[in-house]
UniProtKB/Swiss-Prot annotation:
PROSITE patterns: KH_TYPE_2, RIBOSOMAL_S3. Keywords: Ribonucleoprotein, Ribosomal protein, RNA-binding, rRNA-binding. This is Small ribosomal subunit protein uS3. HAMAP family: Ribosomal_uS3_B. The gene is rpsC. Residues 238-248 have a biased composition (Basic and acidic residues). Disulfide bonds: none annotated. Residues 218-248 are annotated as: Disordered. Gene3D superfamilies: 3.30.300.20, Ribosomal protein S3, C-terminal domain. One of its GO terms (cellular component) is cytosolic small ribosomal subunit. Residues 39-113 form the KH type-2 domain. It comes from Synechococcus sp. (strain JA-3-3Ab) (Cyanobacteria bacterium Yellowstone A-Prime). It holds the Pfam family KH_2. SMART domains: KH.
Length: 248
């Protein structure tokens, strides 16, 4: 079960919360859900260079509270808060163009302290490098090393498509550390992304295991222990497994 279901949806109500938190009458629910989709699409497009990790939406009467988690919050805020004002005006215009009534929009920006431990940012980085035609094995090796330095307990990366321009599409994946998908208390961050290459579409999936959390408790911010300098050792190269034969 844990191998097939979405890792985030599997843990909703246990250790993870919904990305949109509000209640509405059945008649208004579709319109508000559409608004959430418009807000996320607009912010994702406008903040593509800010390292956007997550968008949380809350509603209170005629007010919308947005919490934006970004690796580069300065890009979102702008000089003197000009970026936030532009976002509010742009969101108001976008929502009104689709028939939504005017609402008060409040934006709170939170900095992502460990960008290399966020599955969304890792998947986006892999896709960007694939579009620049860099060898996928080199990309995956560098991403795994960065994630391990960020203090994650496990990471799994899966790439599918015409890898390195091959004639036949295939799926390859690699894993370092633990990824306990069946354990509900395991804090697993999952993300997928698409790379538009000259050879076609390549799909990227990333699982990041950040530790275990007891139900009802907040996830503590993990601190990366300071490591003493040591002699350089021979690093084991990640191994890849080809799933194309199994899936066929």
């Amino acid at each position: 079960m844990g191998q097939k279901i979405h890792p985030t949806g599997f843990r909703l109500g246990v250790i993870k919360e919904h990305r949109s938190r509000w209640f509405a009458d059945p008649a208004r629910y579709p319109a508000l859900l559409r608004e959430d989709d418009l807000i996320r699409a607009y912010l994702t497009k406008q903040l593509s260079s800010a390292g956007l990790a997550d968008i949380q939406i809350e509603r209170k009467a005629d007010q919308i509270d947005l919490e934006i988690r970004a690796a580069r919050p300065g890009v979102v805020v702008g000089r003197g808060g000009s970026g936030l004002d532009a976002l509010r005006q742009g969101l108001q215009k976008e929502l009104s163009s689709h028939g939504s009534p005017e609402r008060t929009i409040r934006i709170n920006v939170v900095e992502v302290t460990r960008a290399d431990a966020e599955a969304v940012l890792l998947a986006e980085n892999i896709a960007q490098q694939l579009e620049r035609r860099i060898a996928f094995r080199r990309i995956v090796r560098q991403v795994i090393q960065r994630a391990q330095r960020a203090g994650v307990q496990g990471i799994k990366i899966q790439i599918a498509g015409r890898l390195n321009g091959a004639e036949i599409a295939r799926t390859e994946w690699t894993r370092e550390g633990r990824i306990p998908l069946h354990t509900l208390r395991a804090d697993i961050d999952y993300a997928d992304h698409i790379a538009q290459t000259t050879f076609g579409v390549i799909g990227v999936k990333v699982w990041v295991f950040k530790g275990e959390v007891l139900p009802g408790q907040e996830r503590p911010e993990q601190k990366v222990p300071l490591q003493q300098p040591k002699r350089r050792q021979q690093r084991r190269r990640p191994t890849f497994e080809d799933r194309s034969a199994v899936e066929a």
